[in-house]
């Protein structure tokens, strides 16, 4: 809550500052931690409902510029050490799109275009890479999503070597159907049948 307020104040004063938020921080509260489950251990830690509401408000108003995955996978044995001893972080990449659609787009917080801006165009602009748009002549790095396709998150199906997530078993909307890198289809999901067409994708 305080961070969003300070960022807003800094922007009003003309400071060159940007801010990001992760799907787990606008989806979960500290109340989700009901047992010694290190899949909920992340940095910053989960906060109150009031804090989550402020993050969502910041995204809607534009005070927060980006949605970032904060992808921090860990081996299963590392997260099994218990909440105190386990490392911080979760596998955020493979759930980020569906959580954003489910928690923000479907609830009217962001439009689909605003979601694309927060997750693609604006991050690319901030870090200075010529990506994040569908304009002619730009890099053909594209994700095609079915926003209405529902599925249940299953960490066992993750392509990442890290399977640590607090969202295992959560029903979400928004399935990635195709991933295109440099004009080449490298991933497809046809009615639940996933195919990684080319693991040796070009460097982004």
Predicted regions and their residues:
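Histidine/acidic residue-rich metal-binding segments in metalloenzymes
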Residues: 1-67
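Short, glycine- and charge-enriched coil/turn segments that flank and shape catalytic ligand pockets
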Residues: 12, 33-36, 81, 106-109, ...
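Residue-level signal for inorganic ion chemistry
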Residues: 20, 70, 100, 183
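Fold-independent oxyanion-binding glycine-rich loops
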Residues: 21-22, 71, 147, 170
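Conserved protein kinase catalytic core
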Residues: 26, 76, 152
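His/Asp/Glu-enriched, well-ordered alpha-helical/loop segment
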Residues: 39, 60-61, 66-67, 73-147
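A short acidic, glycine-rich active-site loop
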Residues: 40-50, 89-91, 165-171
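C-terminal cap of metal-dependent C-N hydrolases
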Residues: 82-85, 139-202
């Amino acid at each position: 809550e305080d961070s969003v307020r300070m960022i807003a104040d800094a922007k009003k004063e003309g400071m060159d500052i940007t801010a990001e938020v992760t799907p787990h921080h606008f989806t979960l509260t500290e109340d989700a931690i009901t047992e010694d489950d290190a899949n909920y251990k992340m940095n910053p830690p989960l906060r109150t409902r009031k804090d989550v509401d402020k993050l969502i408000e910041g995204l809607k108003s534009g005070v927060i510029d980006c949605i970032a995955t904060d992808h921090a996978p860990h081996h299963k044995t590392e997260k099994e050490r218990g909440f105190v001893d386990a490392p911080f972080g979760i596998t955020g990449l493979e759930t980020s799109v569906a959580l954003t659609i489910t928690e923000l787009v479907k609830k009217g917080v962001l439009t689909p275009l605003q979601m694309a801006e927060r997750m693609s165009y604006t991050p690319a602009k901030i870090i200075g890479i010529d990506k994040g748009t569908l304009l002619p002549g730009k890099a053909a790095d594209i994700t095609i999503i079915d926003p209405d396709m529902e599925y249940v998150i299953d960490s066992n199906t993750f392509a990442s070597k890290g399977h640590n997530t607090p969202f295992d078993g959560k029903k979400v909307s928004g399935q990635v159907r195709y991933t295109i890198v440099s004009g080449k289809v490298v991933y497809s999901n046809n009615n639940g049948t996933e195919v990684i067409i080319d693991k040796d994708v070009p460097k982004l």
